[in-house]
């Protein structure tokens, strides 16, 4: 059996060019650079923990994106981006869908109550020893036990950036 493929050489060249452009495009999911230094610092402390501040490590980005349902959703959008580029369409909407799926996956992971739970002092407030000031200080509790969520600033800041 013999197979012959006939295609427009210019169309094939254009498809290859579109796929190469897509290959050099990055969809970065997490805290965008516009989130500001304070939120990046808070996320770093939460991800890695802080023995001095008695904050346990609560990794969020990598575990959230590694969950099968999140990975599958992002992969589905990326496959659609490749198909769009191959058809000569702009894959931007599919790349945005991939980024949004990743950001939504991070928020869903936070909503699933990342262990360990908040300490009683974090939830209810109370007196704690401030090592830096070398004195006891009163900390107002946040009133609920949802790790990685207090004001909603960090939670709502998760997003994506597309770098071409």
State where each predicted segment sits:
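Short, Lys/Arg-rich flexible segments
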Residues: 1-164
